[in-house]
UniProtKB/Swiss-Prot annotation:
One term of GO molecular function: DNA binding
Descriptive protein name: Uncharacterized protein ORF67
Top-rank lineage group of the source organism: Viruses
Ranges annotated as biased composition (Basic residues): 1-10, 18-29
Pfam families noted in UniProt: ResIII
Native source species: Ostreid herpesvirus 1 (isolate France)
Region described as Disordered: spans on this chain: 1-30
Coiled coil: none
Length: 596
């Protein structure tokens, strides 16, 4: 529209152009519709030029200020679509749970000084997103706390976490682990008798504190630590994890036999819910001073970019090498078979992990003359692997870190917390399947496991939501002091599980809380026909790849070669004599898969 100007006072004002009739008739603007494509163009114009330190794979620059929550997105060249609806509006169900007031931002050393300085009785709630050093603060506090008894009680929710904390303490003080029952009992007796000669840490699972060792007169300690408090106390409030009578007995032991006889109560979690803090303070009881500490991040966020894809993992594509990220499964096969990269995948179910492994092996192109070494690590595969080792059937690895180090594709159950960070050095891509369901662990625990994958070579997380369920937390019971927590968690679960859209929004908000610089994208969607759930194709491909139930495990000594049957679990061996068997090498070349 042509403009003319008119002087009004000392200013020139733009006026509409005159019509042909010269009457100055007002011109009605055309109805303009801003399309999604126009918004994308507008965003691209505002993107700053790409600096020299950009990782070509991630499309993300170095973070100058690790506390800056503004996305540092520089674009990418894989064709994915920038998600215009970045972090959705935060609903009250999440605000009320995780965004309370009066939290004090604090560094790790300062937090240790508050926890350990001798003063009156106190309750300390300590939270911090992934990478803030919560475990380090805990271990430092255990080493520096002073008191009259020399005893510290550390309560956890998983036995894996008990073993990891014992490892992290690393000989700085004596550790009594409840898994060693006789030694643990002797340590409790020494503490009650005042016979301890050094600082001692007693590590116990919350399910075991009702033992007779704690039912006597109150057990005196200098400090009680409840690590991953929401996971730990979920054992009490969840109907599926503990019976009502056992939950009441556990609550009574905490409130009557343990908390009144300590000077310091420290509860720790990544996103410590406000009602959980209130409930723990009520359980602590008596007179005390309360501290709410929020640890400042000490390292850059692990992920800068999150690509959302469909989770139809059981699709076998005839041509998986084309770069199409419409599903997580296609992104996985592209990274493995086209790029030859090592990847790590988290899934919420043991069964899902096994099915995903089968489909990854079945998607191998015919011209691809290697087989990826796919390792599944869940509670069931761990126990089965240990049983084979004890029976002297195989010489395979057992520990999660050793298995992750040798795998080409590492699939683990996100609901089985390893209790510690995993070194993923050499892994080029991370994939996460999420699920909102009362049969699996909480969404917070699923998210937390994504942050335990340290030192991976990519800053991109490929993720997708498998399914949602109405009222997924309906199995949470009301326990006196934790009643408000249970009520608000059920409300949060109902909102997350009420629709697939709410589930996606909820995970975006929680990812943004965990990784402040993260930028969301949507995987490229291209229409095509799928051989969807075609079992004939899957079974035929698996037979061609020798990924059948019966595998030959090769030991270094030929006299010990034998067949081992394990459902859906391919077994591998080293030092295979060449040209004596029909076999394929793994991608890394460390192992060979023998054809049945």
């Amino acid at each position: 529209m042509r403009l003319r100007s008119q002087k009004r006072g000392n200013k020139f004002v733009a006026l509409p152009a005159k019509t042909r009739k010269g009457k100055g008739k007002k011109l009605k603007p055309k109805n303009l519709t801003i399309t999604k494509k126009d918004e994308v163009k507008k965003i691209k114009k505002t993107i700053t030029p790409k600096p020299n330190n950009i990782d070509e794979d991630d499309g993300i620059g170095e973070v100058d200020d690790i506390m800056d929550i503004t996305p540092n997105y520089q674009g990418n060249n894989d064709g994915n679509e920038l998600d215009l609806q970045q972090t959705p509006i935060i609903p009250n169900e999440i605000k009320d749970l995780f965004m309370g007031d009066n939290w004090r931002k604090i560094s790790g050393p300062h937090a240790v000084s508050i926890i350990t300085k001798p003063q009156h009785r106190r309750y300390i709630a300590l939270k911090g997103t992934m990478g803030t050093g919560k475990t380090h603060v805990t271990v430092e506090s255990l080493n520096k706390i002073t008191g009259s008894t020399g005893s510290i009680l550390l309560i956890v929710g998983r036995k894996e976490l008990a073993n990891e904390i014992e490892r992290r303490i690393n000989g700085s003080c004596k550790v009594y682990n409840y898994l060693e029952k006789e030694e643990f009992s002797n340590g409790i007796s020494l503490s009650r008798g005042g016979l301890l000669t050094e600082r001692c840490v007693f590590i116990v699972c919350v399910n075991s504190i009702t033992t007779d060792l704690f039912k006597e007169d109150g057990f005196k300690t200098d400090m009680i630590v409840v690590d991953e408090v929401e996971t730990t106390f979920m054992n009490i409030v969840s109907e599926s994890l503990m019976t009502y009578s056992a939950a009441i007995e556990t609550r009574n032991t905490l409130v009557e036999k343990l908390f009144p006889y300590t000077n310091v109560l420290l509860t720790i979690d990544a996103a410590l819910a406000e009602p959980m803090v209130v409930g723990c303070a009520k359980m602590f009881g008596g007179k005390f001073e309360e501290y709410k500490l929020d640890l400042v991040r000490i390292r850059p966020p692990i992920y800068h970019r999150a690509v959302q894809c469909s989770t139809a993992y059981n699709i076998i594509d005839h041509n998986p090498l084309e770069k199409r990220y419409d599903t997580l499964f296609n992104a996985i096969t592209y990274h493995v078979y086209e790029l030859g990269k090592r990847i790590v995948i988290s899934v919420p179910y043991h069964k899902t992990a096994l099915q995903l492994k089968r489909h990854i092996l079945a998607a191998r192109p015919q011209h691809f003359h290697k087989i990826p070494h796919v390792v599944v690590y869940t509670a069931k595969t761990r126990d089965a692997r240990l049983a084979r080792i004890k029976a002297l059937q195989t010489g395979e690895q057992y520990g999660i870190e050793a298995l992750a180090k040798e795998a080409d594709v590492f699939i683990f159950n996100s609901c089985m917390s390893a209790g510690h960070s995993l070194n993923m050095d050499g892994y080029e891509a991370c994939f996460s399947y999420f699920l909102i369901n009362h049969m699996t662990c909480s969404v917070m625990e699923q998210l937390q496991m994504t942050a335990r994958l340290r030192n991976n070579n990519s800053k991109t997380l490929y993720w997708g939501l498998m399914n949602t369920m109405n009222d997924p937390l309906r199995g949470i019971r009301d326990i006196e002091e934790l009643k408000t927590y249970s009520t608000m968690m059920r409300k949060f679960g109902k909102w997350m599980g009420s629709s697939f859209d709410n589930g996606i929004k909820g995970f975006k908000i929680l990812l943004k809380m965990a990784y402040p610089n993260i930028v969301f994208e949507k995987g490229v969607v291209k229409s095509r026909e799928y051989p969807y759930k075609n079992n004939e194709i899957i079974n035929q491909t698996m037979q061609n790849d020798a990924s059948v139930l019966r595998k030959l495990f090769i030991n270094p000594e030929p006299s010990k070669w034998r067949f081992v049957t394990q459902e859906h679990e391919a077994l591998y061996g080293k030092d295979l004599p060449p040209r004596q068997f029909n076999y394929y090498s793994t991608l890394s070349g460390l192992y060979n898969v023998v054809l049945s």
